[in-house]
């Protein structure tokens, strides 16, 4: 089952920041949430795997929601009030993670989708045959 996040990774010097950036990377296998200040220094991070989900359960929307709540718990303790959200990747947990961020009470200045899209660059991998 899901274990509570008692050990959330925090930098040793607890800097008070009023504004930050929340990066949500949603792949097909996992969802990783990284919270940085405006200069890019990591304040906290969490993922579905670090929140206690294993194997195929890491890719579920519920796992992304729990990972976002675990990462945002540090922000609320540090007093962050405003954040920007950068969504990346095609995973199933991106909308649920965004919903958890909105419900946390942090004021969002904007939400941006920064998923890299090729302009017909490299050849795509072959289709799966099951």
From Swiss-Prot:
GO terms for cellular component: chloroplast; ribonucleoprotein complex; ribosome. Keywords: Chloroplast, Plastid, Ribonucleoprotein, Ribosomal protein, RNA-binding, rRNA-binding. Its main location: plastid. PROSITE patterns: RIBOSOMAL_S11. One of its GO terms (molecular function) is structural constituent of ribosome. It holds the Pfam family Ribosomal_S11. Coiled coil: none annotated. It is found in: Plastid, Chloroplast. One of its GO terms (biological process) is translation. PANTHER family: 40S RIBOSOMAL PROTEIN S14/30S RIBOSOMAL PROTEIN S11. Part of the 30S ribosomal subunit. Belongs to the universal ribosomal protein uS11 family. HAMAP family: Ribosomal_uS11 (MF_01310). This is Small ribosomal subunit protein uS11c. The gene is rps11.
């Amino acid at each position: 089952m899901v274990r509570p996040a008692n050990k959330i990774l925090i930098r040793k010097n607890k800097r008070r920041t009023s504004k930050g950036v929340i990066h949500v990377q949603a792949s097909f296998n996992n969802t990783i949430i990284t919270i940085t200040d405006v200069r890019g220094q990591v304040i906290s991070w969490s993922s579905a795997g670090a929140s206690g989900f294993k194997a195929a359960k890491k890719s579920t929307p519920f796992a992304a929601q729990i990972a976002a709540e675990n990462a945002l718990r540090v922000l609320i303790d540090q007093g962050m009030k405003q954040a920007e959200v950068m969504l990346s990747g095609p995973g199933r947990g991106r909308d649920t993670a965004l919903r958890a961020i909105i419900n946390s009470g942090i004021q969002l200045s904007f939400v941006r989708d920064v998923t890299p899209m090729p302009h017909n660059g490299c050849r795509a991998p072959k289709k799966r045959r099951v």
